[in-house]
């Protein structure tokens, strides 16, 4: 049986994430102490809300250094929504805030308009398609292994991750033509801007692949 540990730090929809992993009979542990992090086989950092609040939650529980150590261990790591954003170096959401620095880059506002110059709704909410990126690696050996191009997943966000190295962008989505990082990857670490646990069969397939790493 595969096992996964989900960080419980007061910011995130833990139950829906846990249920998605339990769908595949995974053993799920909700992590509330630093010691549990390094003993995990796979680690998931969920999150909704503001970047600053998320980092404060991790700091309060003394999770920062154990997360960094886990990420360097080579074991599978997945950040979801805010969790993905916190993987980066910093965020400009309501000020300047330091992130985990697992992947170099910054979190910036989703553009307020499409490529045609027309304003669109912020936050970006709803189903959007996954597209390959020009410099990212092939999906065949990643958590997107069985995902057809242009599969739709569910987004809810006002900010987006911008890795410094475009090769870390595994998949994008286009919001009125504006490219947004949908999946990022650096060796054993993955981040999904969308919610796989809310993305139907496509999201479940991604979760299943993560359990098989």
Swiss-Prot record:
Residues 3-213 form the Glutamine amidotransferase type-1 domain. Signal peptide: none annotated. One of its GO terms (cellular component) is cytoplasm. It catalyses: 5-[(5-phospho-1-deoxy-D-ribulos-1-ylimino)methylamino]-1-(5-phospho-beta-D-ribosyl)imidazole-4-carboxamide + L-glutamine = D-erythro-1-(imidazol-4-yl)glycerol 3-phosphate + 5-amino-1-(5-phospho-beta-D-ribosyl)imidazole-4-carboxamide + L-glutamate + H(+); L-glutamine + H2O = L-glutamate + NH4(+). One of its GO terms (molecular function) is glutaminase activity. IGPS catalyzes the conversion of PRFAR and glutamine to IGP, AICAR and glutamate. The HisH subunit provides the glutamine amidotransferase activity that produces the ammonia necessary to HisF for the synthesis of IGP and AICAR. The active site is at residues 81, 195, 197. This is Imidazole glycerol phosphate synthase subunit HisH 1. It comes from Legionella pneumophila (strain Lens). Keywords: Amino-acid biosynthesis, Cytoplasm, Glutamine amidotransferase, Histidine biosynthesis, Hydrolase, Lyase. Its main location: cytoplasm. Heterodimer of HisH and HisF. It is found in: Cytoplasm. Pathway: Amino-acid biosynthesis; L-histidine biosynthesis; L-histidine from 5-phospho-alpha-D-ribose 1-diphosphate: step 5/9. InterPro entries: Class_I_gatase-like, GATASE, Imidazole-glycPsynth_HisH.
């Amino acid at each position: 049986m595969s096992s996964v540990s989900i960080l419980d730090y007061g910011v995130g929809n833990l139950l829906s994430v846990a249920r998605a992993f339990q769908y595949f009979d995974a053993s799920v542990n909700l992590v509330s102490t630093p010691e549990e992090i390094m003993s995990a086989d796979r680690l998931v950092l969920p999150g909704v809300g503001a970047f600053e609040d998320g980092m404060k939650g991790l700091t309060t529980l003394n999770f920062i250094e154990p997360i960094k150590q886990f990420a360097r261990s080579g074991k599978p790591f997945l950040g979801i929504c805010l969790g993905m954003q916190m993987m980066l170096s910093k965020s400009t959401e309501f000020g300047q805030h330091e992130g985990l620095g697992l992947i170099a880059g910054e979190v910036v506002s989703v553009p307020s308009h499409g490529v045609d110059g027309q304003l669109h709704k912020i936050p970006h909410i709803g189903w959007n398609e996954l597209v390959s990126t020009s410099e990212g690696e092939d999906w065949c050996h990643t958590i997107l292994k069985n995902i057809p191009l242009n599969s739709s997943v569910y987004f809810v966000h006002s900010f987006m991750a911008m890795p410094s190295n475009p090769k870390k962008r595994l998949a994008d989505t286009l919001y009125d033509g504006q490219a947004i990082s949908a999946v990022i990857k650096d060796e054993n670490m993955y981040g999904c801007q969308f919610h796989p646990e809310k993305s139907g069969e496509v999201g479940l397939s991604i979760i299943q692949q993560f359990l098989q790493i």
